[in-house]
Amino acid sequence: MAIKRSHNSPPATEENLLTPNPTIEETEKAAAEIRPQSLEDYIGQQDLKANLKVTIAAAKARQEAIDHLLFYGPPGLGKTTMALILAAEMGVNCRITAAPALERPRDITGILINLQPRDILFIDEIHRLNRVTEELLYPAMEDYRLDVTIGKGQAAKIRSISLPPFTLIGATTKVGSLTSPLRDRFGLIQRLRFYAVEELTAIILRSATIFNIPITEAGAIEIARRSRGTPRIANRLLKRVRDYVQVKGETIISPQLAAEGLNQLNVDSMGLDWTDRLVLKTMIQQFQGKPVGLEAVAAATGEDAKTIEEVYEPYLLQIGYLNRTPRGRVVTSAAYEHLGLLAKLPKNKDRSLPLFEF
């Protein structure tokens, strides 16, 4: 019996190369090798680096822990890397965990008790902390004190344990999902932005040197243009293009070979993959380019609504292919042009669609 592939299914050979979330390969030794070890080595995020240099210098002069920090922005932009750099600059340890791993009070209690003076605790996806764990962090962040409840019912007692001064660094893709009491306890809240092509080119050339991958600057630019403004994706695409060039029997990554390899992987000239194009084409063809809600797009494409919102939408919004209006998501004329669907552009649709409708 022949099995037909649904039009809503990606090609069987396609990897999810453009997800900003780390793969298993990227969480192991290879990622450690390409991670910058100091602020000087860190490429991009100039405003953030300038602020952190002042914070580090002041904390060192006073011999104090850095104030608590909150990093927010799309995944893959370097929040974890920046936490590790801060620890290295301060000469302290960095304990890394994620909010979903802190299910029970003893999970966070054990970590806090074992921190050394001025150590850094990095909590990824901090917006997903449960209420009990979050409330344990309040006195820990404010007074370096851990309040532990011993016993149950009327016999319950609260025991306070002193903690050494430490720095909590939270990372989130949804800063608006943090409760006000938690957000207000961070002394510095910084946004990480998408990277420019020039910055990604420098990152790719640096990674190519570390991995001993021959590449021209033009080849690096071609990969950078398709990397969705995200270093993690840039390094991933570099490795896949390296494989393509090797199998082709070539010795150096040129812009032509980079373009060929990425086209074969369904990554187009703007960094859109199969799913990006499916989302945009569905909104254009099935909903006639009219404003449409997130759940409707998810149902029509067969993709998870959360995945569309957190993985695909940020970049489409960034490059101006998608707008959010009070009535729903709207595809812009720039996206029609990129997809070769200008003929389907509604006649009353201006070439520069405003971000909001009035």
Curated annotation (Swiss-Prot):
User: Which stretches does the entry tag as region Disordered?
Assistant: 1-24
Region (Head domain (RuvB-H)) residue ranges read 269-358
Residues annotated as binding Mg(2+) are 80
Keyword Heme among record annotations = no
Region Small ATPAse domain (RuvB-S), annotated ranges: 196-266
Question: Any idea what job this protein has?
Answer: The RuvA-RuvB-RuvC complex processes Holliday junction (HJ) DNA during genetic recombination and DNA repair, while the RuvA-RuvB complex plays an important role in the rescue of blocked DNA replication forks via replication fork reversal (RFR). RuvA specifically binds to HJ cruciform DNA, conferring on it an open structure. The RuvB hexamer acts as an ATP-dependent pump, pulling dsDNA into and through the RuvAB complex. RuvB forms 2 homohexamers on either side of HJ DNA bound by 1 or 2 RuvA tetramers; 4 subunits per hexamer contact DNA at a time.
Quote a single Gene Ontology cellular component term. Holliday junction resolvase complex
Q: Where is this region: Large ATPase domain (RuvB-L)?
A: 13-195
Q: Which reaction does it catalyse?
A: ATP + H2O = ADP + phosphate + H(+)
- Where would you find this protein in the cell? Cytoplasm
Which organism is the protein's source? Microcystis aeruginosa (strain NIES-843 / IAM M-2473)
- Specify the enzyme's EC class, one word: hydrolase
- The entry's protein name is Holliday junction branch migration complex subunit RuvB
Keywords from the UniProt entry: ATP-binding, Cytoplasm, DNA damage, DNA recombination, DNA repair, DNA-binding, Hydrolase, Nucleotide-binding
SMART domains on file: AAA (SM00382)
What the entry lists under SUPFAM superfamilies is as follows: P-loop containing nucleoside triphosphate hydrolases, Winged helix' DNA-binding domain
Summary of subunit composition and partner proteins: Homohexamer. Forms an RuvA(8)-RuvB(12)-Holliday junction (HJ) complex. HJ DNA is sandwiched between 2 RuvA tetramers; dsDNA enters through RuvA and exits via RuvB. An RuvB hexamer assembles on each DNA strand where it exits the tetramer. Each RuvB hexamer is contacted by two RuvA subunits (via domain III) on 2 adjacent RuvB subunits; this complex drives branch migration. In the full resolvosome a probable DNA-RuvA(4)-RuvB(12)-RuvC(2) complex forms which resolves the HJ.
Binding of DNA occurs at 324, 329
The major lineage groups are: Bacteria, Bacillati, Cyanobacteriota, Cyanophyceae, Oscillatoriophycideae
- Superkingdom, according to UniProt? Bacteria
Any single biological process term in GO: DNA repair
Q: Which family does it belong to?
A: Belongs to the RuvB family.
Q: Name one GO molecular function term.
A: ATP hydrolysis activity
